[in-house]
Amino acid sequence: MNSVQLKDVGLDLAELIADISRKTFQETFGPVNTEADMQLFLQKQFTTDKLIKEVGIPGNRHVLAYVDGIPAGYLFLKYHAHALLLNDPALEISRIYCLEKFQGKGVGKSLMLEAIMDANRKQLKWVWLGVWKENAKAISFYRSFGFNTFGTTDFLLGNDWQEDWLMARKC
């Protein structure tokens, strides 16, 4: 039986968060981007030092998902508004990552429901996120939770500028 458990994490697990970040990003985007762009991005964005700083910022929340006791993915939440959402109180899902071998086991669903419940507990008006417009699997997943596109933003992967969609749902 696959049982998903969620646990808030702090600085002590920043290295594990960095490892999961690098692995899931490579699994998801490596096949459709150049090796040079991927390496440049991974070396800048998912260092242990950077993740330690990120985890230590008040108001950020990292939630680790375990399947049968094994780390399977994580959620990174930021509590701030977006101008295109009228600057209403909001929660940004900055990352929702699941290792490939655990996809289809309820990890993503558990993490998404935790984000939505957190926003509701805090009486926020929106949950929003950015997603690469070419990531059809993720877009379909987000739509299944009621997310709709409300704008676009540029995203630099290595030396390659890409367009991300901004998606949101009301709480």
Each language-model region and where it sits:
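C-terminal "cap" of GNAT-fold acetyltransferases
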Residues: 3, 91, 125-139, 144-145, ...
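Acetyl-CoA-dependent GNAT
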Residues: 8-14, 18-31, 39-101, 112-114, ...
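K/E-rich alpha-helical interaction surfaces of small helical-bundle regulatory domains
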Residues: 24-28, 140, 148
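Conserved phosphate-binding and hydrolysis motifs of nucleotide-dependent enzymes
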Residues: 69, 73, 106-108, 146
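Short acidic-aromatic loop segments in the C-terminal HATPase_c
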Residues: 97, 147-148
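Active-site acidic-Proline motif in GNAT/NAT acetyltransferases
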Residues: 99-101, 105, 133-134
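Conserved acetyl-CoA-binding loop-helix of GNAT-fold acetyltransferases
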Residues: 104-117, 140-144
